[in-house]
Design a protein with these regions (language model features):
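Short strand-turn segments of transmembrane beta-barrel domains in outer membranes
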Residues: 24-49, 77-106, 120, 128, ...
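Outer-membrane beta-barrel transmembrane strand signature
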Residues: 70-108, 117-121, 206-251, 340, ...
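Non-catalytic regulatory/gating segments with a bias toward low-complexity or hydrophobic composition
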Residues: 14-15, 244
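Glycine-rich phosphate/pyrophosphate-binding loops
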Residues: 115, 380, 672-692, 699
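Single conserved hydrophobic/aromatic residue that forms the stacking wall/gate
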Residues: 2-9, 13
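Transmembrane beta-barrel wall of Gram-negative outer-membrane proteins
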Residues: 91-173
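Conserved small-residue
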Residues: 28-79, 178-179, 185, 554-658, ...
Length: 724
């Protein structure tokens, strides 16, 4: 564990870009081209099937059909798509695939006194939403990004080196104007448009009427119009990163201190964004029929705008970081490698998007860290680290946290008794580490040791009761003894190399997070808190394993092949949560379950005719479902607490957590002479997503929303209630 990452947030400079190398200028040009396509879109029924299924549901609830057979036939035959539409909204608003491309130029070279590296890159991609060629403005979804990075390394003297790294990018993103996500900066409407496509039924209206008018009812937006006729949002993002460092090799100035270096680093980063919103509401219509001549009759449902409206949004942040360090590295007697590091750092961050006076204040942290490592003849390794970090969020006496760690390793293949296996087993290393990591960030809360005072409506007075006196009251309650959240990390790993071309790495990891920041849940209202106070309360365990496999092999002098893959499994469990002992004994308990778990009722089957008495009530022994009156074919839920009724007290964990437990990837790279080709695939599993409301339930939103999934023929049928 590196001493600079004692804190669970970025606190240091990690410059991993290419540095200049001594030699003549080397120029490398690389181009990539790819495609993106949705791979797991749900399948919905078409319009006619939708009407038939809704008729079945309506018969159960009211004994009547919602749609006539003539309307169903007209929808299926497509004889009049204006009055009897049949639309697959997902296909109507998305493309089958979209292209993306990347081009980069890398120039590298230099001398012993000055080395340089320059990287220029462009990346562009098209978005998935469709456009209407008849629209006069550009409402397409697309992105362009331009990057530049330059590194200069200069030796002022034989013992003094200066490093300068400057980089940045400019990103231009254009999207349709429709958006409901006002909390995103900048906004990304694609998700909002896809949600509309999920909600709108295939029969609500066509994509566009034959007379060119845009259809929409009074309560829901036309997904196609949202993608093509809502104006556009043009966003610009710019970022600049700069790092300046001076390194002095003290050992070259005074030989007794050989191996000792001093380094000072300063960085300044800025991020800024602005969006121009040229949005427009389109006048929409709904068809009411046809006149005697067959012309389409429509009525206005929403009055639109005659022009594109204009508004703008902007924001950004800046970060200043300083670091000073002393490092020591020396090999003694050709056997004992000793390395040491001592550093101090400080960080100042200002959020230009701050929404309150408190959050507009600079975020400041500082700390010291140290590392000492020893290795013997490249076989045995041991290392110790510590970080001592201060935080603005805690009171005096609790601001500083101490986070030590230790690591060790054994490179078995460097032992003499392993020399006979070198042709096959090129590397075998066993390693392990244990350490403590700290976190000082509370979600949405700064200076947690201070109470906040806010204002609001006080009391009403006057003969008519329309006079008020505003007052002030306590908001967040300050907690003096709040301190660092800590994580104990253990890692045991092995590295294997075979035939100098195959590398295998496997790690088991275990983490125990303690003193987790959370707002107390079990404090009674009689305590008088306006907001539940924060506390170091909570324990979560996380464990799993990580593995990777890589093969690099040359076939002759012209062909090179690389194969690689990785797999990670991680599962967590809440060991302590602020809930009563009585709650812990129920299925609703958070304790004992993973983070990000969904809770709900567990379906145990469907109600059948024999579950009901003649008067329609449930037979004895079947729990009463309190949400609504149930009928044959309705879902039957488990009464987990065995109190004879099904209600919110019967909630239990359902599905998987919302964060994947398994992440994997695999790919390859091939090079023949001066040409190379690579591909990489990645995925995740053991994860659940909750789809509910208008996204799931047909007939919701007053009956006009909610699609029906294509597997609806699996539904309960009174004529065959027990089919599988």
């Amino acid at each position: 564990l590196h001493p600079r990452v004692r804190r669970q947030r970025q606190m240091c400079i990690r410059d991993r870009t290419k540095r200049g190398q001594i030699g003549k200028p080397r120029i490398q040009i690389k181009a990539d081209y790819g495609f993106s396509a949705p791979t797991m879109l749900p399948e919905f029924v078409d319009g006619a099937k939708y009407m038939e299924v809704m008729n079945v549901a309506s018969q159960f609830s009211s004994g009547k059909d919602m749609y006539t057979q003539a309307a169903i036939n007209a929808t299926r035959n497509g004889t009049d798509p204006d009055l009897y539409p049949n639309v697959n909204w997902l296909k109507a608003v998305t493309k089958d695939y979209v292209p993306s491309g990347r081009v980069s130029l890398d120039i590298n070279g230099g001398s012993e006194r000055l080395r340089y590296s320059l990287i220029l890159a462009y990346y562009g991609e098209k978005g998935m939403t469709v456009t209407d060629p008849g629209v006069e403005y550009d409402a397409s979804n697309k992105l362009s990004r331009y990057n530049i990075r330059t590194n200069l390394d200069m030796n002022l003297t034989p013992s003094t080196e200066i490093n300068v790294s400057l980089g940045g990018y400019i990103l231009n993103q254009r999207t349709p104007g429709y958006t409901t996500s006002s909390d995103e900066n900048p906004r990304t409407p694609f998700t909002d448009i896809i949600k509309l496509a999920f909600k709108n039924t295939p029969i609500v209206h066509p994509v566009i009427y034959s007379n060119g008018q845009i259809p929409a009812n009074t309560s829901q937006t036309n997904p196609w119009a949202a993608a093509t006729h809502s104006g556009f949002i043009s966003s610009y993002i710019s970022s600049l990163q700069s790092v300046f460092a001076v390194t002095q090799d003290i050992g070259k100035l005074w030989h007794p201190l050989k191996g000792l270096k001093a380094k000072a680093t300063f960085s300044f980063d800025t991020y800024a964004w602005n969006s121009f919103l040229r949005t427009k509401k389109q006048t929409t219509y709904m068809a009411t029929g046809r006149d005697a001549d067959g012309n389409l009759l429509t009525s206005v449902t929403n009055e639109g705008d005659d022009y594109l409206k204009y508004s703008k949004e902007a924001g950004g942040n800046r970060t200043m970081y300083m670091e000073g360090q002393l490092s020591y590295s020396r090999l003694l007697a050709d056997a004992h490698q000793i390395d040491g590091l001592l550093l101090y750092n400080m960080r100042d961050y200002v959020d230009a998007d701050a929404t309150s006076a408190i959050n507009s204040l600079p975020h400041r942290t500082q700390g010291i860290a140290a590392r000492l490592s020893y290795s013997y003849k490249g076989r045995y390794f041991i290392e110790g680290n510590f970080g001592y970090n201060g935080s603005e969020n805690f009171s005096k006496g609790h601001k500083w946290g101490f986070f030590p760690s230790v690591a060790g390793g054994w490179l078995v293949t460097n032992e003499k008794f392993m020399e006979s296996t070198a042709s096959v087993l090129s590397k075998l290393k066993i390693r392990g580490s244990y350490g403590l990591v700290g976190n000082d960030q509370l979600s949405g809360r700064r200076f947690a040791f201070l109470s906040t005072i806010t204002s609001g409506t006080g009391y009403v007075y006057g003969t008519s009761g329309n006079q008020t006196i505003n007052g002030r009251f306590e908001g967040d309650f300050g907690i003096e003894d709040l301190s660092w959240e800590t994580v104990k990390k253990t890692d045991i790993g092995i590295e294997i190399g075979l035939w100098d071309c195959i590398n295998i790495q496997a790690d088991y990891f275990h983490e125990k997070r303690e003193d987790i920041f959370m707002q107390r849940k079990t404090i009674p209202e009689t305590a008088g808190f306006n907001k539940n106070p924060w506390a170091n309360f909570g324990i979560v365990k996380n464990q799993g394993f990580d593995a990777s496999l890589e093969m690099n092999k040359s076939f002759g002098k012209d062909f090179f092949l690389s194969l690689r893959g990785n797999f990670t499994f991680s599962r967590n469990k809440i060991l302590e949560y602020d809930e009563s002992e009585a709650m812990k004994q129920t299925t609703r308990a958070r304790t004992g379950n993973p983070l990000n778990t969904y809770y709900g009722l567990k379906a145990v089957g469907l109600f059948q005719e024999e579950d009901f008495k003649a008067d329609g009530t449930l037979v004895d022994g079947i729990p009463n479902h309190t949400f609504e009156q149930v009928k044959p074919g309705d879902i039957r839920y488990e009464d987990t607490n065995h109190d004879g009724k099904v209600d919110t007290y019967d909630y239990q964990p359902i599905g998987r957590p919302s964060v994947p437990e398994i992440v994997y990837g695999f790919g390859f790279s091939a090079r023949w002479k001066s040409f190379d080709f690579s591909a990489f695939f990645q995925g995740s599993t053991n994860v659940s997503n909750m789809i509910q409301g208008d996204m799931l339930i047909p007939g919701s939103g007053g009956g006009g929303l909610g699609n029906i999934y294509a597997n609806c023929d699996d539904r309960w049928d009174p004529n065959d209630p027990y089919r599988q």
